[in-house]
A protein has these predicted regions:
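Hydrophobic h-region of N-terminal signal peptides that target proteins for export
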Residues: 10-18
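Pepsin/retropepsin-fold aspartyl endopeptidases
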Residues: 19-297
Length: 297
């Protein structure tokens, strides 16, 4: 019996700036600064398989999930105490928050370094990520979203475990079917058999999820699935689809995908399990905050 893991730290935010106030400076133990090589490293969590980096928030090392399904970068509220200086709380009284969180978000501004990306004064959403943290093999401090990932080049070759910032030299790139949202997320127009299904490209999800009626291959059986988001975790029996292919780009099929099959209204997600044999590449777009996603045939 398999366990299916699911992270959904998606938050849509409008009207970021609304005034600031100086944050208190909590005391914190000195921590060793990671080397440049460690800051460039992309790894996989031993339990969930999600992608992790060490980022610097206000010059403080933080372990963060790389999540193409998140519009904004999120910091766990318990990790704020690690920050010693050089950050400010943002007045959120006039900010409209939209998304799946049931919490009342806070925000702070701080220098952020994620891989080769540097944002001198980045707005980070502050939430309790206890549910997300409970599903990870190591303690994480937050989530890196498309607000900074959208301006960075990266390659995720899960089959070869080649995860790095940049793109392979001389590679032939095929654009993913679909469109980018206003928050920089990729909505893939995937071909599941004879049906075209819009799916969120979500590296913050370890498992692919579809509506039951959209999976022509049918149901393989029931599995015990543990899923969670920024609010809570749930566990129970869910339907698993029979393995089949999903076409996501011209001449590129994701092989033997076995998604969770759910009722209408549930998120429709293209997760890391579907990318296990694929090479996903993101390139920035000149003059835009967000780039484009490609596959290698």
């Amino acid at each position: 019996m398999k366990n299916a893991l699911r992270m959904l730290p998606v938050l849509l935010i409008g009207g970021l700036a609304a005034g600031e106030e100086q944050a208190p400076k909590p005391t914190a133990a000195e921590v060793a600064m990671p080397s440049e090589a460690e800051l460039m490293k992309i790894e996989r969590d031993a339990h969930s398989g999600l992608l992790l980096i060490t980022a610097l928030v206000a010059d403080t090392p933080m372990r963060m999930i790389l999540d193409t399904g998140a519009t904004h970068t999120i910091l766990h509220e318990g990790s704020v105490a690690k920050l010693k200086k050089n950050y400010f709380w943002i007045d959120t009284s006039h900010i409209i928050f939209e998304g799946n969180t049931q919490q009342k978000p806070k925000m702070l501004a701080a220098p952020l370094m994620a891989g080769p990306g540097i944002s001198p004064r980045h707005a980070l959403v502050v939430l309790n990520l206890g549910a997300v943290r409970s599903m990870m093999g190591e303690e994480i401090d937050g989530i890196i979203g498309m607000d900074i990932l959208g301006s960075l080049p990266f390659t995720f070759n899960l089959k070869q475990n080649e995860l790095y910032w940049g793109t392979p030299e001389g590679a032939v790139l095929t654009p993913l079917y679909g469109t980018m949202t206003r928050g920089g997320r990729m909505m893939v127009k995937a071909k599941c058999g004879s049906k075209e299904v819009e799916m969120l490209l979500d590296t913050g999800s370890a498992i692919t999820r579809l509506k039951k009626g959209d999976w022509e291959a049918g149901v393989a059986g029931e599995i015990m699935a543990k899923m969670g988001n920024v609010n809570h975790t749930t566990q129970g029996k869910m339907l698993e689809g029979k393995p089949a292919d999903i076409e996501v780009a011209e001449g590129v099929k994701l092989r033997n995908v076995a998604p969770l099959l759910e009722e209408p209204g549930a998120p429709v997600l293209l997760g890391l399990d579907a990318l296990k044999e694929a090479v996903l590449i993101h390139l920035p777009t000149e003059g835009s905050d967000y780039g484009k996603f490609f596959m290698m045939p």
